């Protein structure tokens, strides 16, 4: 179930938005009723979107996690709140804490952010699988180069996996601008 951070929490460190949370829970409950599994997938690429004038537009600002406008603590806050809301659903297969982070700050690398998030979630949910995407769009072909530091992450509950992505175009970018033919 992909979702956007700014839709579920319109103000960093604020409450979860009830209407969006209710939609998520309705979907999750339907999946549970059908004995299906759900992966909650924050689809923000390592960023928080600040809407221009409070609405979605081309003037939106995408703020990278780890700077003063969007701190690691802000990121941990939303996941701690989400985990508290969803921990009792049996159909939740895992929390994909961030889809395809890229261009993270050198001062706050993705592995630092991920470890803080792991710790925050485990304060409220010790059962659910944690899914950690690699750096630079979770690149499988460049994993050793860009995501090797993730091997040092520690889940105190030992229930964590890594997620790598492969795009089958000539440069593994996912743009498919050139054919293999």
Describe each PLM feature range:
Residues 9-94, 110-123:
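An active-site-proximal structural segment forming one wall of the substrate-binding cleft
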Residues 1-4:
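Catalytic domains of carbohydrate-active enzymes, especially glycoside hydrolases
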Residues 77-94, 98-181:
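Extracellular glycoside hydrolase catalytic/binding regions
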């Amino acid at each position: 179930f992909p979702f956007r951070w700014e839709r579920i929490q319109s103000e960093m460190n604020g409450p979860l938005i009830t209407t969006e949370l209710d939609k998520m829970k309705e979907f999750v409950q339907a999946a549970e009723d059908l004995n299906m599994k759900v992966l909650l997938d924050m689809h923000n690429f390592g960023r928080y979107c600040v809407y221009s004038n409070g609405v979605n537009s081309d003037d939106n600002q995408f703020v990278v996690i780890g700077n003063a406008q969007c701190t690691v603590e802000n990121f941990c806050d939303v996941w701690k709140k989400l985990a508290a809301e969803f921990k009792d659903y049996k159909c939740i297969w895992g929390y994909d804490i961030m889809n395809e982070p890229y261009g993270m700050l050198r001062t706050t690398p993705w592995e630092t952010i991920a470890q803080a998030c792991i710790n925050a979630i485990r304060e409220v949910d010790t059962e659910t699988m944690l899914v950690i995407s690699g750096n630079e769009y979770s690149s499988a072909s460049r994993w050793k180069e860009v995501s090797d530091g993730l091997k040092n992450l520690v889940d105190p509950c030992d229930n964590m996996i890594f997620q790598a992505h492969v795009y089958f175009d000539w440069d593994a970018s996912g743009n498919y601008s050139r054919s293999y033919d």
